[in-house]
């Protein structure tokens, strides 16, 4: 295989990875939109959070396809892993900080698990896209950021299992 053909395959692979991330982001955003009304019924702050997550994830889909820069990919990883960690905290420790249900532990549900799996998939796909066609220095930095995110999620999962 010539180096030109190999380069085209790698570029196509990265593009496919970005399409996976964009599709999962759209899915997670639509799932958040689906449950936004019930969260507004609980408290305006919960509803506003879900509306913000919806907007961010739906808008992220075209952004990551049009401008797949390192900062855009890293922002997607950090943002989605933050939502995953908040989700796991609300299912183990309780809703943090604000609102009438602060401190209450939420139940796991089918729709929210689907959204969380989508968000983890986004982080993995974006991490893979970061590692393709990168310099050794930026690859190390990207791996470190992805590793910190995954260790953080792993730690929260550990807390979930320990709490149940």
Regions found by a protein language model. Give the residues of each.
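Juxtamembrane boundary at the C-terminal end of a transmembrane helix
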Residues: 153-164
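Short aromatic-rich membrane-water interface segments that cap or initiate transmembrane helices
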Residues: 102-117
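Transmembrane alpha-helix entry/boundary detector in multi-pass membrane proteins
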Residues: 14, 34-56
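Membrane-embedded alpha-helical segments in integral membrane proteins
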Residues: 24-39, 159
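Short, Lys/Arg-rich, polar N-terminal cytosolic tail immediately upstream
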Residues: 1-13
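Core segments of alpha-helical transmembrane spans in multipass integral membrane proteins
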Residues: 23, 27, 47-63, 78-88, ...
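Membrane-interfacial entry segments at the cytosolic side of transmembrane helices
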Residues: 70-74, 132-147
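Alpha-helical transmembrane segments
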Residues: 18-30, 147-152
């Amino acid at each position: 295989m010539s180096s030109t053909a190999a380069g085209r395959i790698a570029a196509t692979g990265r593009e496919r990875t970005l399409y996976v991330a964009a599709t999962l982001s759209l899915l997670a955003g639509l799932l958040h939109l689906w449950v936004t009304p019930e969260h507004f019924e609980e408290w305006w702050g919960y509803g506003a959070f879900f509306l913000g997550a919806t907007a961010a994830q739906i808008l992220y889909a075209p952004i990551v396809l049009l401008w797949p820069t390192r900062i855009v990919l890293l922002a997607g990883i950090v943002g989605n892993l933050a939502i995953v960690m908040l989700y796991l905290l609300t299912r183990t420790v309780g809703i943090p900080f604000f609102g009438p249900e602060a401190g209450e532990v939420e139940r796991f549900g089918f729709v929210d698990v689907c959204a969380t799996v989508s968000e983890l998939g986004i982080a993995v796909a974006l991490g893979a896209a970061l590692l393709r066609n990168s310099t050794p220095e930026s690859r190390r930095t990207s791996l470190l950021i992805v590793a910190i995110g995954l260790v953080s999620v792993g730690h929260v999962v550990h807390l979930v299992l320990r709490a149940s």
